[in-house]
Each structure stands twice: as structure tokens, then as C-alpha cells.
């Protein structure tokens, strides 16, 4: 009964916590990436013309429907987007809780794992509502990994088998966006494990791999038509950078692991070598978890923890490979990547606690609880710091609202600095459009 209540109630309480945080730390105003979105899609929110291009899949098509709902019923509220993100994060926590309940993990451990999902190390994604769809994508990733688990049960699961044939298309073509590469790679590697370790039917696995690779291929083709804006990135080649700064990539990669313990901002003025040592410690935990997973997956008949830790590790690699161009060793510690890294941390902890149940040794128990304590303490500090910062962030959002409302009288420099977008002309264009349609900061309730 306790496990069931934990799996169902804690995600609800977590959602309420995020709701309270968002209301205390943000205000309803377009800024940063919203400027681009307004200019691209809000001239006629019902129009399909922005999607009738080769790069359609990079625009994450589900946003078309969500944007219509937001404009029609909420007057293009960024707060609505933020609440959607919080809701899907809570749904992720619910799926994790159900897995812990099924595996009969201790109630206290299950509760702490669920609470880790609601760490405010993701504050940057939570407060930028345009990222709501990424939280939704991770719900679908979890559904895929849990469907693999259902498939591995002795009786099998025909519904799960059918689901795994259509779920990748829904996920990749409509929700995943740039996250689909790691999802696709994780799904394919999982099928390889299923064939080699579980001796399952190769033909069925091949069909599921094709079901992943076909939509991913379409996304890859679509992405080739897109043009990305990367302000602040170097134009040097990676070879030139490695020659001039040989430690940049290793430090970038290692320190990204430190951010799963403590957020960069909450760490304050800690010297960089502390981040490096912390990152190496987390990497060591990853190595132990992968080693234990090799022995564990057959006994548990479960791919879920392995998929989580595998995708988390691959996300660290992807962020390093795609963001080194900003030439900052701590760039990978940004809160905007916390959602991608978080799955690895959860998979690691699940493997450790499932190992405790299997082996029952003191060493396994100490390792599991030690790792849990490390992640919990770090994330408590990060969350406490972010709660402390909430009123200051609120002040910043209120200032953005005032500048946005009075954009006509503001200088270009003020608009660029306050609304965190590089092009003052595009900012003015977006705000004129919102003003003409009485949306967002220009919406006034009728008495």
C-alpha cells in the first residue's frame, strides 16, 4: 500500500511544488527563443505554411496544435507552456514510481528517486516554457523503455510488442526534435542487448529497429534543410581547438557529470578542480553501474535502468560533441542540459538498488546508499539555492514585462539586453505582432 501511495501521490505533490515555484519565480512574458517563435508562427497561428518546408520535423510538429490551444484559450501565455512542462515532468516521475513499485524497492528509496526528478537543477528549462515539449518527449522515451521491459517478461506482452512498432514514429516525428538521436541510438542498442543476452527472435527485434530507424532517417533528412543560429560559437575547427586547448574537451565532458550532483550556480565560487573531481566520482559510479548492469539485467529481466543510464551517458557525450564550440569548460554544466543528464543518474541508482536486492552484501548496500546520499545532498543544495533565487528571478521577469510593454520607447540596447535576444529589429517585430493581436503582455481582461 505504501509503495502504491508513494508512486501516485509524490508526483502530484511534485507538480504542485513546481507550480508554486514557477509562480514565485516567473511572470508571463515572451523573451529569448519566444521572439523567434512569435515571428515564425503567430502571424497566423492556424497556417500550415511554416511547416511546408523540408525542415518541418525540426520544428517539432506537435507545437502546431499546442500553439493553437495556447493562443485560442490562453492568449499566448508562456505560463501555460511552463505548466505543461511541469505536468510532463510529473508524469515522468509517475512512470518512475510505478517501476519502483513493480520492483518492490524500499518505500524510502522510491520516494527519494521520485523527489530527485523534481530537483530545480532544471530551472532554466522549466522557466523557459518553450521547452515544454522536451519534457513530453522524455515521457515517451520512458514509455518505450518500459514497453521493452514488458516484452521481456516470460509471458511476453503483445500490446507492448505492437506499441513498439508505432511509438517511435510518434515520438521522433512529432515530439523528440533534437533529442531523437540519443533516443534512437538507445533503442537500437537495447534491441542488440535483447538479441544477444536474452536470445529473443532476431526478426522481431529487426522489425522494431526498422520502426525506429525509418522515422529517424526522415528526421535526419529534414534536419539537413534547417539553418541553425549559434551566436557566440567559435569558427575554428575542432582540430585547431584541440591543438591550442588540449584539455578543453576532457574537462568539458568530465565536469558535465558534476552537474548531476550540484548545479553550477548553487556551487557558488567553488574552484574548477572541485567540479573535475566531482565529475570523475560520478563517472566512476557510471562505470560500476554499467558493470553491475551486465549481471543484473538477465536476473531482473529488465532493460529500463540500462536504457536510462545508457541514454544519460550518451547525452553527456552528445552535449560535449555539439557544445564544445562555445569554448567554455563549464558550459556542459548548464541547467538547460539537466533533463538529459538526469535519466542517467536515475538509471544508475536503480541499478545499484536492484543489485542490493539481488546480492544483499554490505558493500552493495553501502555503495547504493552512498550514491543516493551524494545525489540527494547535492540536489537539495541546488533546489534550496534556486528557491532562494526565485524572488530575484521574479523581479527580472517583471522588468522584462515592463520593457516588453513599453518596447516602442526603449532603446535597441535595452531590448536586446533585457529580453535576451540578439536582434532588436526582430524583438520589435515580435512585440508589434503581439500588440496587434492583444496577446501575452498586451492582453487585458475585459471587465
Q: Can you say where each PLM-predicted feature lies in the sequence?
A:
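Membrane-embedded glycan-lipid processing machinery
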Residues: 28, 80-84, 122-133, 333-337
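Transmembrane-helix signature of polytopic, membrane-embedded enzymes
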Residues: 100-120, 138-139
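Hydrophobic transmembrane alpha-helices of multi-pass, membrane-embedded glycosylation machinery
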Residues: 181-198, 217, 352, 356-357
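Intrinsically disordered, polar/acidic, low-complexity terminal segments
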Residues: 6-62, 67, 71-110, 151, ...
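Specific aromatic-rich, kink-prone transmembrane helix
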Residues: 133-156, 165, 188, 344-347
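Transmembrane alpha-helix segments characteristic
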Residues: 13-14, 110-117, 213-217, 298-325
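Membrane-interface alpha helices of multi-pass inner-membrane proteins
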Residues: 160-188
Amino acid at each position: 500500500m505504501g509503495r502504491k501511495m508513494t508512486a501516485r501521490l509524490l508526483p502530484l505533490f511534485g507538480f504542485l511544488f513546481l507550480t508554486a515555484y514557477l509562480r514565485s519565480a516567473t511572470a508571463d512574458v515572451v523573451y529569448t527563443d519566444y521572439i523567434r517563435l512569435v515571428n515564425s508562427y503567430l502571424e497566423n497561428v492556424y497556417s500550415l505554411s511554416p511547416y511546408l518546408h523540408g525542415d518541418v520535423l525540426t520544428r517539432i510538429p506537435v507545437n502546431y496544435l499546442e500553439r493553437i490551444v495556447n493562443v485560442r484559450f490562453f492568449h499566448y501565455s508562456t505560463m501555460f507552456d511552463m505548466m505543461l512542462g511541469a505536468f510532463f515532468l510529473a508524469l515522468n516521475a509517475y512512470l518512475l514510481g510505478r517501476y519502483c513499485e513493480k520492483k518492490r524497492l524500499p518505500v524510502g528509496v522510491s520516494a527519494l528517486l521520485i523527489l530527485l526528478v523534481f530537483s530545480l537543477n532544471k530551472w532554466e528549462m522549466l522557466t523557459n516554457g518553450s521547452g515544454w515539449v522536451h519534457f513530453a518527449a522524455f515521457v515517451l522515451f520512458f514509455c518505450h523503455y518500459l514497453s521493452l521491459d514488458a516484452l521481456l517478461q516470460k509471458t511476453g506482452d503483445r500490446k507492448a510488442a505492437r506499441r513498439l512498432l508505432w511509438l517511435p514514429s510518434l515520438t521522433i516525428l512529432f515530439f523528440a526534435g533534437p533529442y531523437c538521436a540519443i533516443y534512437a541510438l538507445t533503442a537500437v542498442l537495447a534491441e542488440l542487448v535483447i538479441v544477444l543476452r536474452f536470445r529473443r527472435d532476431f526478426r522481431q527485434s529487426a522489425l522494431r529497429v526498422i520502426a525506429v530507424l525509418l522515422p529517424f532517417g526522415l528526421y535526419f533528412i529534414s534536419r539537413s534543410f534547417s539553418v541553425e543560429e549559434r551566436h557566440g560559437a567559435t569558427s575554428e575547427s575542432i582540430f585547431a581547438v584541440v591543438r591550442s586547448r588540449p584539455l578543453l574537451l576532457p574537462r568539458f565532458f568530465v565536469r558535465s557529470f558534476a552537474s548531476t550532483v550540484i548545479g553550477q550556480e548553487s556551487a557558488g565560487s567553488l574552484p574548477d578542480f572541485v567540479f573535475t573531481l566531482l565529475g570523475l566520482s560520478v563517472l566512476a559510479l557510471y562505470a560500476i553501474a554499467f558493470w553491475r548492469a551486465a549481471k543484473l539485467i538477465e536476473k531482473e529481466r529488465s532493460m529500463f535502468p540500462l536504457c536510462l543510464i545508457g541514454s544519460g551517458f550518451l547525452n553527456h557525450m552528445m552535449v560535449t560533441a555539439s557544445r564544445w564550440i562555445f569554448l567554455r569548460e563549464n558550459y556542459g554544466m548548464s541547467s538547460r542540459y539537466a533533463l538529459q543528464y538526469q535519466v542517467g543518474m536515475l538509471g544508475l541508482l536503480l541499478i545499484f538498488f536492484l543489485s542490493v536486492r539481488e546480492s544483499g552484501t554490505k558493500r552493495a548496500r553501502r555503495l547504493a546508499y552512498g550514491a543516493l546520499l551524494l545525489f540527494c545532498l547535492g540536489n537539495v543544495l541546488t533546489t534550496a539555492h534556486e528557491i532562494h533565487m526565485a524572488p530575484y528571478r521574479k523581479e527580472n521577469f517583471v522588468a522584462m514585462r515592463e520593457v516588453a510593454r513599453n518596447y516602442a520607447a526603449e532603446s535597441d540596447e535595452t531590448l536586446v539586453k533585457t529580453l535576451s535576444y540578439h536582434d532588436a529589429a526582430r524583438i520589435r517585430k515580435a512585440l508589434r505582432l503581439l500588440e496587434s493581436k492583444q496577446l501575452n503582455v498586451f492582453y487585458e481582461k475585459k471587465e
